[in-house]
Amino acid sequence: EALGTDCAKFEQFPILTKFIDASNNLSIQVHPSNDYALKNEHQYGKTEMWYVLDCEPNAFLYYGFDHEISKAEFAERIQNHTLTEVLNTVPVHKGDSFFIPSGTLHAIGKGIVVAEVQQNSNVTYRVYDYGRVGADGKPRALHIEKALDVTRRTPPEKHDFGSHLAQCEYFTVDVKKGAFDGAADEKSFVSLLITDGEGELICGGETVAVKKGDSFFLPAGSG
């Protein structure tokens, strides 16, 4: 009941929310669709979105390709370490948002802090990790063959979400500034992330002080 009627179709809690502070360039990666992930990983795939909370001057991220390439070229560029030459390099600013459907190659760049809302899944296929090694001293695993299977090798599509920041089957994301009234109706819970400032949250007859970095689960029907 706490999740709401719209969540009855999901077999597990539908989303995860995170704060990501990239002190270095993160790996270039892709997430599979539900169909592919269920068949090959026995898990769901992943669609996600980023909301940029802060960034260093001249920060950028990778978001899909800047032009369409073939599967053969994709594989070759992974092997010869020239993949970034054909990726869509996007300068970022505080307040920017990016919707990342499954199959979209992506990577957060150094000096960027984002709030991430994602489908509840851990399936990630890395294609490039800058030669870094893990705690065991060995290069971190890459998943090139599976990435070749699932990656859309075209520029990212443009999306119109109307008044929402992002919207898909798994989540709807809105940005609220200043005071606002109830959002958690009987259809769905609300995951509330405090991204700036401080204030008060009044829910179910209780008042809670909130500040930047806090997160709250508001049960369905709590107003």
Please provide the spans of the model-predicted regions.
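Active-site region of the double-stranded beta-helix
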Residues: 1-94, 109-192, 196-198, 202-204, ...
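N-terminal intrinsically disordered, low-complexity, charge/repeat-rich segments that act as generic
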Residues: 31, 100-101
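Noncatalytic modules at the cell exterior or secretory-pathway interfaces
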Residues: 95-99, 223
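Short, charged beta-turn/beta-strand-edge "cap" motif at the junction between a beta-strand
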Residues: 104-107, 222-223
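Extended, charged low-complexity segments
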Residues: 216, 221-222
